[in-house]
C-alpha cells in the first residue's frame, strides 16, 4: 500500500472515517492540453508523484519502464505513469485520453490527459467535454503555438471558464522572468479574443524538476504567486447546471415487472422532488412525480448530476429520448438550429450531407443546410468556406428529421450538446454545441388524416428500423 495513504487513513481514524471524509470533499475535473511535447503527461506524473499518489510497486515499475522507454535520460520519466498505450511509449507522445484520479486534504481531482498532436484534436475535445478547468501547457522555449490557440478556443467553446496557463520547462530557459512575462503578454493578447468572461491564471513551472507544481520553487524567487496545486485546490467552481431549470432526459424505461414502471436517467440540471408537477416533451403530457428511486433507496428530492429513476402517478407514453421538465416551463420544439461544430473526420463536412445525431438520450437524423463560417484559430476571425475540414471549427446550420427540444449549449451542456455520426460507418465524425435554436417546429398542412398521422407515429415509435419519416416534419 502507498505509505502516505496508509498514514492518512490512520490519521482519519480508520478506513470508514477516511471514506466518509472523501465523500464530503469537493471534486474538480480538469484537463491538460497544449501543443505536442509541451510536457502534459510529465506534469500529471509530477502531480501524482509529489502528492504521494503512487504505490510502491508502481514506482518500481516506473523505474524499469524509464530505462526501457524513458525520454529523460537517467531521470525518472513521469510521463509513463499516464502514457499507457504501447504506441504512446514507443513514440513518446499521448494519443488517447488518459484519466487519472488523485486527492489531497482539500479536494478530489479527476484529470484528463489529452493529446497535443493536431490529428488527435478529436480526442482533446472528448476530454474537455466533461471538465471544469483547463491547464494549458506552453513550452517556455516555443511560446504560444497554433495548438495552444486551438485548445484554448475549444475549451471555451465547451463551456470551460477557468484556464490555468502553465508555462513549462522554465529550467530550459534558466528560469527567466523575462521569458515568462513575454509569453504571458502574448497569451493575454490572444485571450482577449476568446468569448465569455474567463478566469485566467499563469504559473511558471518545471514539471520535470517539480518547480512550482506542488511546492514553491527556489529557482524562481521573482514569482510570488501560488503553486499549480494551490490553484487547483482553491479555485472556486460554480456549476451552471445547479441554477438552471430542471431537465431530465429519459435514458431507459425501467419495467422489471408488472408493478413497476420508472424512467431512468441522470438529472441534467436543476432539482426534482416528490409531488412535483412535470411535463413530458415533445408530447406535452403532464403528471406528478410519485417516487424518486436511487441505488440507495427512495429519496424526497434529487439534484443535478444524480442518476435516478422517476416514477410518475399516471401511466403515460414516455420513451427513451423524451425530456421531463417543470410543468410551468415552456420549451418549444425546434426543427433546425445553428450549431458550433468541431469536425473530426478526414472527409470534410459539406452542405447537403445527412448524419445521425445523438443529443442526450435522443437519436435522429439531421441535414447540413449550410456552413456560415469557419473560425481561424490564429486570430479567431470568421471566414466563409465551402466545407469544414478535419479539425475545423465553424458554425453550421442543421435541419432535423423531427422536432427536437434543445437548450443552448452554454445554458445546458447535456441538452445542448450533440454528436454527428456517419450513417454508413457508424463513426462519430463531429461534436456539436447548439448555438441557437432558429425555428419553431410547426405542423405541416393538413394533407393527412388523423388516422394516417397516428399510424405514422405508431410505426416510427415501435418499428424504427423501417425508417419511416415523420409526416408532420414534412420529410
UniProtKB/Swiss-Prot annotation:
Pathway: Sulfur metabolism; hydrogen sulfide biosynthesis; sulfite from sulfate: step 1/3. Residues 25-239 form the tr-type G domain. Residues 206-208 are annotated as: G5. Its EC number is 2.7.7.4. Residues 92-96 are annotated as: G2. It catalyses: sulfate + ATP + H(+) = adenosine 5'-phosphosulfate + diphosphate. GTP binds at residues 34-41, 113-117, 168-171. One of its GO terms (biological process) is sulfate assimilation. Residues 168-171 are annotated as: G4. NCBIfam families: CysN (TIGR02034), PRK05124.1 (NF003478), small_GTP (TIGR00231). This is Sulfate adenylyltransferase subunit 1. It comes from Escherichia coli O127:H6 (strain E2348/69 / EPEC).
Amino acid at each position: 500500500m502507498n505509505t502516505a495513504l496508509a498514514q492518512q487513513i490512520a490519521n482519519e481514524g480508520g478506513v470508514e472515517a477516511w471514506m466518509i471524509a472523501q465523500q464530503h470533499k469537493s471534486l474538480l475535473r480538469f484537463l491538460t492540453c497544449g501543443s505536442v511535447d509541451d510536457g502534459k503527461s510529465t506534469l500529471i506524473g509530477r502531480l501524482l508523484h509529489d502528492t504521494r499518489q503512487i504505490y510502491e510497486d508502481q514506482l518500481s515499475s516506473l523505474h524499469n519502464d524509464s530505462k526501457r522507454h524513458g525520454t529523460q535520460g537517467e531521470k525518472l520519466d513521469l510521463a509513463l505513469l499516464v502514457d499507457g498505450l504501447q504506441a504512446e511509449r514507443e513514440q513518446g507522445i499521448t494519443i488517447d485520453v488518459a484519466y487519472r484520479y488523485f486527492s489531497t486534504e482539500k479536494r478530489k481531482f479527476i484529470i484528463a490527459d489529452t493529446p497535443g498532436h493536431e490529428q488527435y484534436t478529436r480526442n482533446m475535445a472528448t476530454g474537455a467535454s466533461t471538465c471544469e478547468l483547463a491547464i494549458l501547457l506552453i513550452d517556455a522555449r516555443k511560446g504560444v503555438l497554433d495548438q495552444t490557440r486551438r485548445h484554448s478556443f475549444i475549451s471555451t467553446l465547451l463551456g470551460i471558464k477557468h484556464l490555468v496557463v502553465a508555462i513549462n520547462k522554465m529550467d530550459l530557459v534558466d528560469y527567466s522572468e523575462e521569458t515568462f512575462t513575454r509569453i504571458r503578454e502574448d497569451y493575454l493578447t490572444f485571450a482577449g479574443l476568446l468569448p465569455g468572461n474567463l478566469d485566467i491564471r499563469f504559473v511558471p513551472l518545471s514539471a520535470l524538476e517539480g518547480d512550482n507544481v506542488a511546492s514553491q520553487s527556489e529557482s524562481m524567487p521573482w514569482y510570488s504567486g501560488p503553486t499549480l496545486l494551490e490553484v487547483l485546490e482553491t479555485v472556486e467552481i460554480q456549476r451552471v447546471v445547479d441554477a438552471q431549470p430542471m431537465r431530465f432526459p429519459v435514458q431507459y424505461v425501467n419495467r422489471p415487472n408488472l408493478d413497476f414502471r420508472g424512467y431512468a436517467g441522470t438529472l441534467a440540471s436543476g432539482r426534482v422532488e416528490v409531488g412535483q408537477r412535470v411535463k413530458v416533451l415533445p408530447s406535452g403530457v403532464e403528471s406528478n412525480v410519485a417516487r424518486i428511486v436511487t441505488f440507495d433507496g427512495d429519496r424526497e428530492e434529487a439534484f443535478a448530476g444524480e442518476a435516478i429513476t422517476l416514477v410518475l402517478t399516471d401511466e403515460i407514453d414516455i420513451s427513451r429520448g423524451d425530456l421531463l421538465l417543470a410543468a410551468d416551463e415552456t420549451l418549444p420544439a425546434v426543427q433546425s438550429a445553428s450549431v458550433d461544430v468541431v469536425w473530426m473526420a478526414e472527409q470534410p463536412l459539406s452542405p447537403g450531407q445527412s448524419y445521425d445525431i445523438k443529443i442526450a438520450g435522443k437519436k435522429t437524423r439531421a441535414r447540413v443546410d449550410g456552413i456560415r463560417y469557419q473560425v481561424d484559430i490564429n486570430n479567431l476571425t470568421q471566414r466563409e468556406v465551402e466545407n469544414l475540414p478535419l479539425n475545423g471549427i465553424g458554425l453550421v446550420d442543421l435541419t432535423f428529421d423531427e422536432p427536437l427540444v434543445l437548450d443552448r449549449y452554454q445554458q445546458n451542456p447535456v441538452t445542448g450538446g450533440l454528436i454527428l455520426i456517419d450513417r454508413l460507418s457508424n463513426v462519430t465524425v463531429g461534436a456539436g454545441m447548439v448555438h441557437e435554436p432558429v425555428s419553431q417546429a410547426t405542423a405541416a398542412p393538413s394533407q393527412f388524416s388523423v388516422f394516417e398521422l397516428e399510424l405514422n407515429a405508431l410505426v416510427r415509435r415501435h418499428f424504427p428500423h423501417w425508417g419511416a419519416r415523420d409526416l408532420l416534419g414534412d420529410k
